[in-house]
Amino acid sequence: MPSGELADARTALHAQWDRLRSWVSDVVDADVGGEPSVLEGWSVAELVAHLGRAMEALAVCVPVADGTVPLTFGEYVGTYVARAADIAETTRELAREIADDPLGAVDRSAQAAFARLDELGPDDRVVQARRGPVLLSTMAVSRVLELVVHADDLARSVHRVAGSGAGPDPIEPAALTLVADTLLGIVVARGGWDLEVADERRWLRLAAGRTPYDVDELARALHPRYTSEGVPDLGRMLPVL
C-alpha cells in the first residue's frame, strides 16, 4: 500500500525544491556565485551545484531484491562523514562542468529525481542508493534534509555578501519541521530521551554542525517533554551530520 511517510516526504521535497529554486534564481547571480560561502572551501556557486548533485542521488536509485535489509536514516546519513572530502571534490568538478548553465543543469537533475520518485512509488520499497540500500521514504527525506540544510547555508552566505539582498527565506516551513523532527529522532533513538524541538532552525544548525556545540544553545533548541527532566548533554552525539 502507499506509504504515508513517503507521500509526506514527496510533498515536502517538491515544496522545498520549488521554493529554493525560485530563491536561487532571484538572488544568486554570477557575482554572488563567485563569493565564498559559509562552508569553508566552498563558493556559493559550488553550493548551488551541490543541490543538483543531491537531487541526482535520488535519480540514480534502483530497486533491489526482496528481503534486502535497508539502512536506517541515522545509518545512512552517518555515511556522510567518511566521504566529506570526496563530496567536496566532486561538487567542485561539477560546478566547473556546469558553469555555462548551472541552473539548467540543476533543473535537469531535479526533474530526473522527481521522475524517478514517481516511478519507484507510491509504495515504499527498498532501493539501492549510492551509499547502500534504503527505504525510498528514507531517501526522499534525506533529499529534503539536503535542500533544507543547504538553503540555510545559501541564505547565510548571501547575507555576508556586501550590497546583496538575501530575499525571502528559502526554507519551506513544513520541510524544516520534517527535517528537525527527523534529526531529533536519530538522537532519541540512540539515547532514549523524551525531547521535543523548541527552535527548529537552531536545532538544525546544531545537528548539522553549522553552529558549534554549546549547552546553552542546545537548551534553546530542545526542551524535555516533561518539566521534571532536563536536556541531556549531547556533546558526544552532535553533530549528527
Regions found by a protein language model. Give the residues of each.
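Active-site-adjacent scaffolding segments
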Residues: 1-127
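Structured surface interface patches that mediate subunit assembly and partner/cofactor docking
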Residues: 2-9, 34, 63-73, 119-241
